[in-house]
Design a protein with these regions (language model features):
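Boundary detector for helix-to-coil junctions that initiate low-complexity/charged tails
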Residues: 236-327
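SAM cofactor-binding core of SAM-dependent methyltransferases
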Residues: 14-93
Length: 327
């Protein structure tokens, strides 16, 4: 799940894993996957493509989404074969049948991803590890946590937070404008911070587990065990994409352009707010000046003096001071 939209179209911005469908489905085909679970469906763009892919070969699709939106519920109505698990991933992974492949695109922080990987590994260790494809292993989530609901993360596993944080490439802190997240880590980098950090730590602690990175559309991490029956087939698919320097440069340019558009949209929004404030103040000033010139105001001031023993509730002098004029 991506940042707040700030008036920029989500599909155009490239938030959905559906933009990496060619790589995803090539990997699924290489493993001969007959069951796929998707963690985090958002608006269902990838879910719809997964269902179309599954229909061609008779595969089963499970979507794990604790708060399914109307698009997902509509897909369930249209496709009774789609299994919807309305639970947090850490709960669902304890009891669902471990599929042949998992696509992980849920809450993008170290704790959540580490726990998802741990739970999968506990139930399918070694060469039984399913194919894992994880989104947002590139900037900004590679080395920085973001949170949908920080209170669900144990305090000792939360980074210091900033609300409505604006993130910009090359800035390890936060900026005035950029890709804006409701909750993000105050700083980029360091231990136990970010999606890619979580995956690298998982891979480093386990023999025979490999990681490839497709550096496009916020980055796709592909994890598999080298002793899996389909390991060589997966390697053949992903090696040309893995950390491809041309793709890395293209993604850097794409992100820079996207951030600039976000910044421009936010600055235009701020200008519009200032314009409305000026209009409101001008209207208030016009009303106050009309009041000063009215006989009704003069009578109201005199009546107030009489009722308040010579100390009226309001006076011309007070209104003039409010207008910035000498009393």
């Amino acid at each position: 799940m991506g940042p707040e939209r700030d008036s920029i179209d989500a599909d155009e911005a490239g938030y959905s894993l559906a933009h990496l469908a060619e790589v995803l489905f090539a990997c699924l085909d290489a493993t001969g996957a007959r069951s796929v679970a998707e963690i985090g469906a958002e608006r269902g763009a990838l879910t719809r493509e997964l269902l179309a892919w599954a229909a061609r070969g008779g595969a089963r699709i499970t979507t794990i989404e604790p708060l399914p939106g109307p698009e997902i519920l509509e897909l369930v109505e249209e496709h009774p074969e789609l299994e919807l698990v309305s639970e947090e991933s850490h709960d669902a992974l304890r009891h669902i049948a471990i599929p042949d492949a998992l696509i992980v695109d849920g809450d993008h922080n170290y704790y959540t991803v580490s726990e998802e990987l741990r739970l999968i590994d506990e139930r399918a260790p070694g060469a039984e590890l399913p194919l894992l494809m994880l989104h947002d292993v590139g900037w900004p989530n590679a080395r920085r946590d973001t949170y949908h609901a920080p209170d669900r993360i144990p305090e000792e596993h939360r980074q210091p937070l900033v609300r409505r944080a604006a993130l910009v490439p090359g800035e390890p802190g936060v900026a005035h404008a950029g890709l804006r997240y409701e909750w993000a880590a105050e700083r980029e980098g360091g231990p136990a911070n970010g999606v890619l950090t979580a995956i690298e730590d998982f891979v480093e602690r386990r023999e025979g587990v490999r990681l490839a990175i497709v550096p496009g559309f916020f980055g796709l991490g592909i994890v598999w065990h080298e002793d899996a029956a389909w390991a060589s087939a997966i390697a053949e698919v992903v090696v040309p994409w893995d950390r491809n320097p041309v793709l890395e440069r293209l993604e850097a340019y794409r992100v820079a352009n996207l951030v600039e558009r976000y910044r421009h949209a936010q600055e235009l929004g701020e200008i519009e707010i200032m314009r409305r404030e000026r209009e409101r103040h001008a209207e208030q000033e016009q009303i106050l000046r009309a009041m000063l010139a009215s006989r009704a105001f003069a009578w109201g001031e005199r009546l107030s003096r009489l009722r308040k023993g010579g100390r009226p509730t309001f006076t011309r002098e007070q209104v003039r001071r409010a207008l910035g004029e000498d009393a």
